[in-house]
Amino acid sequence: MKSIIIASLVALAIAASPALDRTFSPKSEYVYKFDGLLLSGLPTASSDASQTLISCRTRLQAVDDRYIHLQLTDIQYSASHIPQSEQWPKIESLEQRELSDEFKELLELPFRAQIRNGLISEIQFSSEDAEWSKNAKRSILNLFSLRKSAPVDEMNQDQKDMESDKDSLFFNVHEKTMEGDCEVAYTIVQEGEKTIYTKSVNFDKCITRPETAYGLRFGSECKECEKEGQFVKPQTVYTYTFKNEKLQESEVHSVYTLNVNGQEVVKSETRAKVTFVEESKINREIKKVSGPKEEIVYSMENEKLIEQFYQQGDKAEVNPFKAIEMEQKVEQLQEIFRQIQEHEQNTPETVHLIARAVRMFRMCTIEELKKVHTTIYTKAEKKVQLVIETTLAVAGTKNTIQHLIHHFEKKSITPLRAAELLKSVQETLYPSEHIADLLIQLAQSPLSEKYEPLRQSAWLAAGSVVRGFASKTQDLPLIRPASRQTKEKYVRVFMQHFRNADSTYEKVLALKTLGNAGIDLSVYELVQIIQDPRQPLSIRTEAVDALRLLKDVMPRKIQKVLLPVYKNRQNKPELRMAALWRMMHTIPEEPVLAHIVSQMENESNQHVAAFTYNVLRQFYKSTNPCYQQLAVRCSKILLFTRYQPQEQMLSTYSQLPLFNSEWLSGVQFDFATIFEKNAFLPKEVQASFETVFGGNWNKYFAQVGFSQQNFEQVILKTLEKLSLYGKQSDELRSRRVQSGIQMLQEIVKKMNIRPRVQQTDSQNAHAVFYLRYKEMDYIVLPIDMETIDTLVEKYVRNGEFDIKSLLTFLTNDSKFELHRALFFYEAERRIPTTIGMPLTISGKMPTILSINGKVSIELEKLGARLVLDIVPTVATTHVTEMRFWYPVIEQGVKSLQSARLHTPLRFESTVELKKNTLEITHKFVVPENKKTTVSVHTRPVAFIRVPKNQDSEYVEAEEKTISHSQYQMSTEEIDRQYETFGLRINAQGNVLSQWTLPMVLMTEQDFEYTLENKNRPVEFTARVTIGNLEKTDLSEIKFDKIFEKEFDLENNESENRRQYFHKMIREIQSEQGFKNLITLKLEAPQQMYWNTELRTVCDKWIRMCKVEMDARRSPMEHENKEWTLRTELLAARPQMPSSLRQLREQPHREVQLAFNAKWGSSKKSEITVNAQLEQSTEQKKFIRNIEREYKGIPEYELLIKAARLNQVNVVSEYKLTPQSEYTFSRIFDLIKAYNFWTVSEKRVQNENRRVVLQLSVEPLSRQYMNMTIQTPEQEVELKNVRIPRVVLPTIARSAMFQQTWEKTGATCKVDQSEVSTFDNVIYRAPLTTCYSLVAKDCSEQPRFAVLAKKINKNSEELLVKVVRREEEIVVKKSDDKFLVKVDGKKVNPTELEQYNIEILGDNLIVIRLPQGEVRFDGYTVKTNMPSVASQNQLCGLCGNNDGERDNEFMTADNYETEDVEEFHRSYLLKNEECEVENDRISEKKNYRNKWNREEKKSDYESSSDYESNYDEKETEKELVKKTLIKEFSNRVCFSIEPVSECRRGLESEKTSNKKIRFTCMPRHSKNARRFLKEAREQTVAELVDFPVSFVESVKIPTACVAY
């Protein structure tokens, strides 16, 4: 009964299946003709292409409703290079190719398929069939696989409604085709008796695709770029034609293209179709096959076997290259290297041979490689041996690497050479566990223990190889991803290396190896190191850097780890900055950026805050397409911050992005420095270069870096050792130093100061230079105490340099020969095609470099000579290729760009010290009978290669150069010959007149430049002589006509100024002067020369100078006389005032310049220029408006600003040749065009051949410029031109030192009641008649101390004591004069210079310190220190200068307190000479910390009377000048003079009323619109000339506070 029921159900199921879904009737045989076409060429119909036509008859027997049996017969194929056409080529137009019997038998083997719902669900092949043959048969079955209707459960209501109307139907469904399991879109159209089914494949929605990719693991993920980069996904369309429910024809068309900059450059195309021939009953059954069931999807089994062989070597189960006999491989390699040896010079053909050798080596077993070694390598010349070594390393298979390591251990390859070869192994295309294990064994071998470069290269290479199979990259290998156990294995190995390391370098190397590996599981180990405070800082920083390759794998995890590190102020600043730097490359989201900005705004360490701001700002400005989202987020987040960094911060990050967003291509240069207060050297310096080409992002294409920890200790120790031979003979100075040290020690004892000992170990101090290439650490160069000691011991004997050893090393003649073959890059991608052949898209750049030469150094008594004789030869070819492969045929298209350079060179350099001169000579020699060649060749090539049937001898491909006809017409022939300097130069070729990169790739071009010398050697000589300074008379300097009418001052002061000027010149001329002569002679063959003399005459203080330059050269083309140039420059600067009073009273405050030049050959041009560097009208008003009397430090700081010269007046008279006049005119036109929007001009009639120029810079912001130029015919005015912030010159005495301290130093101010520390913490603390320690070097070997006290209880005047290691200096002000005592003895003002003391003006004295200086005006002590000096080794009321605001109050015995009184008392020096004012000290109102760490606010106000609106430094901190705007309905009013406002981020704390004048103008007027725009960024200076509309009282802030 059960069997009856089952049979009934089966019958019902069969009956229910619609006949429409049955393509073939059971028990019938169908014959179809199959045609397949391969086309490779350019994406244009007008060029030739390589085309292969394959045809056969297909017998198809429908056994039942589900199974069909198939067999191919009458197989033939033809291939040729013919023009492209939309039609199928006729078989007669192609060359018939012979198919071997072996291949024909394979293709004729039967196969069986199961059909379900019209689709091929299972396939069975003969057990004797080959994989490539199976894929060919799949392509035919692929044409019979068709779903005639949408699955009912997937049809929506509209489709169901349309089902009733068969005229048209569309549906999407996932379906397995030859190219993968992807979404397919069906369209069904009824045309009479015919039904046409069309389906297209959507490759964006694939579940699986049989594809591989190698060599892409060095790229980074760029989400904003096209995911496939240059490769465009294939376009595949199927068309099925049914007539009366029978399949008449089925065709598939696929196109594969490569895009560059959005344009197709090469393409490959496949077409396949089956055409119905006949239908009949089955007469002769096709043999049923019973092989394993397989899918219709392309089988990558053959590719998998190849990959396994590359990765596992002889341990692979199957050798896919076994068919090629050993003798045949050796013969091919022998022929390759024979041809390379015959090529004396490297050519593109040599590069092609190297690429072939690499391909052959990848096919070799260990035995075959041994045969190559004994047969070829041992008998070859050195060049071929070196090339064989590098090609084996580039091949990068397990067998080639094992073979190389075997010879490393036998030392037949030197360890240094082995280390070099391992750099190529790092880039292997086929990384595997087997290769990684080999490298780790090498790194741990006794050989590597002896040779550090080899060991380092082995570890770094092992890490890079591990990344290839154990980390997520863009590679798509066929082997399964590494298991967790495998990852844990290598993490354990690398961490064991770290734990076993004894030195810092060893630990750094272990972490760089782990960083190269990029294993996700390593993050847990790295986090432990980063968070372990017991680890050295350099190790923790290196662990942060080791996370770099995980940015795409686990960005959120890295952010979670590094954000707390960055925010934790207990961590060192350089660690925090490194964490931020690494975190930003994970492209954080806005919440993370908000945390970063919040930390920046509340940051107490200014280095960290400034670095953070710069990083955010640079990412916000980036045009890198891969940072687009991050740039948007950074721009949003920066809108809400008020933080502005200090200008002098050295820790910074900057980038230079150069990108084309349309092409998704460009480059970016990054530069970052990380400084710390305790070091003069940067803790970290990085310079990197990253690229994006066609959306492919190489984040760390190249990077060089330097990191160090306490390396200053190494330098100091080394200098101490080198100074052993220096004998000190000055006993007096020695006694003075001992006296100073004793006084410093007494201060330490009396104040109970605990020395600030830096926790640094000089033995652990180290520095590391590293090179990173393609995201891999490539080279690590450590420098530590041991390395320095080795060098010192080698070249220093008994405290003196061992000159003999050094001379022996330098004077040895050194011949060298270098040959290196390498692939700059190699990438490969393989995808299936609908014709059953794999399509390989590859790019590579094989290169060979050879350098033969000799270098020698000859040392003489007073000179040295270097001779370098080399012949470099470079050849390289960039290959972009699309290739189809079958055992019977290989076809494709490639674009080649080749370059070659061969240039013999000889260079000689001599340095000789003669009696009165230093002579340096450089000589460049072009050898005789030698040719220099530079050639470039580009061409697209279509190729076909058909192997011979009899043997596997290598057959050259049949190539045909193809080109884009339209682009080719744009090329032009070049054939030019020159003869110059006795050298024959030939330039010839065929190049594009206008080109783009796609045009270059699609056209044939060639260009060759040759330089040949058939006569004697041609020498080019440059000789520089520098004479000694000689005394001379200054009377020869004449300032005759130097003042022009345009230089006259207002108020008729010009005559007085001129008299003052000439009197000053006469006084200077009465003094002794000095002169110097420098000559430069350039000599070339054929009496070509350029000789220059530069003569300088100046006084001792460089107040007046005369510079003359004479030049002459040999006549050039169209010249019949020697060309000469004679110039003279006179310069005189005014006296440098040291007080405002001197500045006001000084009649002459300008710098005068006079310049004359005369040049030409037969006709001479002459120009005379008088220039005056002066103060503008606004700047002079500023000086006149200084109504209050300033003294001391504020006076000097104001003097620097008041003495700025911000305007230059130039008057030029000229007599020019027409050619010179035209050149100057064009330059002038360019300047006007560049500043089109800010220029105005009018026609005038001025004096002929005379030009007047006035240029003035706005003195406050120094970012805007006005310029007026008057020519004989026009007056041109440029207003408000924005320029980079400039440093204006100032004539104030010693101004340069002060400005340097302001920009790069740290400053502390102390007066009788308030202290502003080095770290900008302001607090109140009263000084008494007992000394308070202002600042002191509190290291174990102190060098200075600065103390201050009140002269008496009721006085505001102070007395300052400076103790240096040499002496004790006491300074006080008495009767407006400074009284200076050194070691208790009064010193006259004329003797102060020998004690490094200087008096500026009447109210300021400067005392130099070993590092820094002290400025004192009687009331305020200002101590300037370098911003990177003595972190945690300074103490005193001025703090520790460590950049942190949170730890200023460290008492004398080195513990932190929040009680300012306790802090102050700890630095009181109590003795019998003073009376402690306990009442004043204990009174709490005298203490106030204006930087509260908990509330993070700055509410201090300036208590000094002299801090004016013109004090730029304080203005930048608190107040800024702005034009006040009042807006009404129809008018806008502007304040005529600038009004003070609190800078952004601050609020007014105190205000005062001031009457302000306003001028009003209509809102619609041009001036109103312009002034509104200018007032947003600067003060509007032009308003002074407008009438006053009204006066109004306005509240002006006098002090600001930040909340």
From Swiss-Prot:
Keywords: Disulfide bond, Secreted, Signal, Storage protein
GO cellular component: extracellular region
Tissue spec: Expressed in the intestine of adult hermaphrodites.
Cited PROSITE patterns: VITELLOGENIN, VWFD
Record note on disruption phenotype: Simultaneous RNAi-mediated knockdown of vitellogenins vit-1, vit-2, vit-3, vit-4 and vit-5 increases life span, causes accumulation of neutral lipid and an increase in lgg-1 foci in the proximal intestine; however, does not affect fertility or pharyngeal pumping rates. Expression of transcription factors pha-4 and daf-16 are increased.
Domain of life: Eukaryota
Stretches assigned to the VWFD domain: 1306-1475
Protein task: Precursor of the egg-yolk proteins that are sources of nutrients during embryonic development. Together with other vitellogenins, may play a role in modulating life-span, acting via induction of autophagy and lysosomal lipolysis.
Name of the protein described by the UniProt record: Vitellogenin-5
Pfam family, one: Vit_open_b-sht
MF-aspect GO terms: lipid transporter activity; nutrient reservoir activity
Region (Disordered): 1492-1513
Name of the coding gene: vit-5
Domain Vitellogenin residue range list: 24-685
Ranges in coiled-coil conformation: none
